[in-house]
């Protein structure tokens, strides 16, 4: 009973509406940039704030923007992985629209293909690596912030990002080689 009263008091002290107003746009952009689908983004957005509430019930939160960005990235990467598993060999064209400034159809198709390939490659690497990579490359997080968030040294973050880039390059090269091989095998 005492714990419940404390929990209710704690939740009342934190103005969730204000937190969502203040951080919601950044959280939404982070999620949508990865999932590229309104329905999936809506679900990830809700899951992010539910997870934040649950975490804040267990321990005090020092940096809400950082926590929300980490949770959002994690939820979005998980969603992409699940979607790729469900649609292993199907085209994921609704996921693959790249952010561009009024490109022509050819540039849109190329950007969509690159985005699809990157999402596929991100789904092949460990979740933590994908999360750190996305926070750095898409979220603009500095090595120091990543080191603090993931309890790593700054040097370890740099090494992990370097290895992740290399692994993604290898996966993308392999995928390109397989695609070319399949195209060559098709009868004319």
Predicted features, each with a name:
Residues 86-111, 142, 182-187:
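Internal acidic/polar
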Residues 132-136:
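A short pre-motif secondary-structure segment
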Residues 70-91, 111, 174:
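Arg/Lys-rich amphipathic alpha helix in sigma70-family domain 2
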Residues 123, 127-128, 139-156:
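Helix-turn-helix DNA-binding module
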Residues 46-53, 62-82, 161, 165:
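Σ70-family region 2.3-2.4 aromatic/basic alpha-helix that recognizes the −10 promoter
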Residues 3-29, 39-42:
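A short, charge-rich alpha-helical start-of-domain segment used by transcription regulators
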Residues 19-38, 54-55, 122, 174:
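Amphipathic, Lys/Arg- and hydrophobic-enriched alpha-helical face
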Residues 73, 77, 150-179:
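DNA-recognition helix of helix-turn-helix
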């Amino acid at each position: 009973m005492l714990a419940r009263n404390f929990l209710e008091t704690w939740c009342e002290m934190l103005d969730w509406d204000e937190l969502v107003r203040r951080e919601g746009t950044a959280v939404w952009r982070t999620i949508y940039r990865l999932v590229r689908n309104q329905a999936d983004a809506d679900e990830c957005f809700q899951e992010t704030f539910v997870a934040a509430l649950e975490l804040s019930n267990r321990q005090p939160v020092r940096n809400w923007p950082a926590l929300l960005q980490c949770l959002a990235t994690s939820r979005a990467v998980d969603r992409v992985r699940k979607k790729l598993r469900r649609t292993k060999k199907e085209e994921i064209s609704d996921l693959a629209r790249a952010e561009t400034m009024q490109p022509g159809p050819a540039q849109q198709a190329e950007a969509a293909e690159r985005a699809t390939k990157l999402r596929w490659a991100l789904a092949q690497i460990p979740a933590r690596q994908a999360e750190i990579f996305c926070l750095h490359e898409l979220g603009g997080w500095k090595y120091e912030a990543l080191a603090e968030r993931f309890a790593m040294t700054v040097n370890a973050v740099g090494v992990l990002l370097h290895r992740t880039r290399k692994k993604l390059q290898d996966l993308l090269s392999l995928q390109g080689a397989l695609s070319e091989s399949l195209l060559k095998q098709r009868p004319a």
